[in-house]
């Protein structure tokens, strides 16, 4: 009788414990916001990376901001933002790039390599340029498309704003001692350059390949249909297009690094996100837009 009573009490206690467990709420991790600012050239890949990361960790919220590489690096030196996306080469005395105050505290993690695509309107008959021709165009020495083998018509220049990593690269690799003509239309983001060129048959501009990845001739994923429907045309430069292969091998003339920058060694959630970006899954996402680093 006593044994039976003990068994009943044990069953009752176990049932009560199960009910209590079922009614208990599963603890949800508190939301965490990570702010990333900087390069607009990296906006497409960062959007894809953060979307993928949030699907794995729903409590992580990303606040993506622009501002450009130069302003982004200045802001993170001052302790603002969790991460900055930048396409600027690190300071190097051998190249004349001196380190601003506070730069020694920055940690640059390379995540990929970008190439600047030279774009024109699809109706433009010009398909290829040399670096010298590109410099002459943007310095204002060449004013008419007819001089380049195209139809007669004024050349409309579209450039990025001062401080943009894309503009800095363009000025260093293309312009040299020359200056971009003051007649150039200045746009704040790469997407704005694409939109302007797409709407102006006389325009020429330069943008990150991320904004033209589906329309690059010679790219493995580019289809004939995509080229036919592309809003802009990517030009050959010195006989090469900015494909992932030519960019990764540094065979294309206008390449630049892609960095995620922290003030001090990355830690905690920031470290975990960077680890994801460098993982096979993250690098596969980077490869949709740029040349991956791994």
What annotation goes with each model-predicted range?
Residues 8-19:
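Bacterial N-terminal signal peptides
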């Amino acid at each position: 009788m006593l044994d039976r009573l003990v068994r009943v009490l044990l069953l009752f206690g176990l049932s009560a414990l199960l009910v209590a467990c079922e009614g208990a709420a599963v603890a949800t991790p508190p939301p965490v916001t990570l702010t990333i600012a900087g390069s607009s050239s990296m906006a497409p890949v960062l959007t894809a990376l953060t979307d993928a990361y949030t699907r794995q960790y729903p409590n992580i919220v990303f606040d993506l901001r622009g501002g450009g590489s130069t302003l982004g690096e200045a802001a993170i030196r001052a302790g603002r933002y969790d991460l900055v996306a930048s396409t600027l080469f690190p300071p190097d005395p051998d190249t004349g790039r001196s380190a601003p105050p506070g730069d020694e505290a920055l940690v640059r993690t390379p995540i990929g390599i970008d190439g600047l695509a030279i774009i024109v309107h699809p109706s433009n008959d010009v398909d290829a340029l040399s670096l010298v021709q590109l410099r002459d165009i943007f310095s204002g020495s060449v004013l008419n498309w007819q001089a380049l083998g195209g139809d007669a018509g004024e050349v409309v220049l579209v450039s990025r704003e001062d401080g943009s990593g894309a503009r800095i690269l363009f000025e260093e690799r293309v312009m040299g001692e020359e200056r971009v003509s003051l007649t150039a239309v200045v746009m704040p983001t790469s997407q704005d350059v694409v939109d302007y060129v797409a709407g102006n048959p006389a325009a020429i501009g330069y943008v990150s390949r991320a904004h033209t990845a589906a329309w690059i001739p010679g790219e493995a994923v580019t289809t004939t249909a995509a080229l036919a429907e592309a809003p802009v045309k990517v030009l050959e430069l010195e006989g090469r297009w900015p494909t992932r292969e030519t960019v990764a091998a540094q065979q294309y003339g206008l390449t630049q690094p892609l960095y995620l920058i922290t003030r001090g060694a990355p830690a905690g959630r920031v470290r975990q996100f960077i680890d994801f970006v460098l993982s096979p899954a993250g690098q596969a996402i980077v490869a949709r837009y740029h040349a991956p680093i791994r």
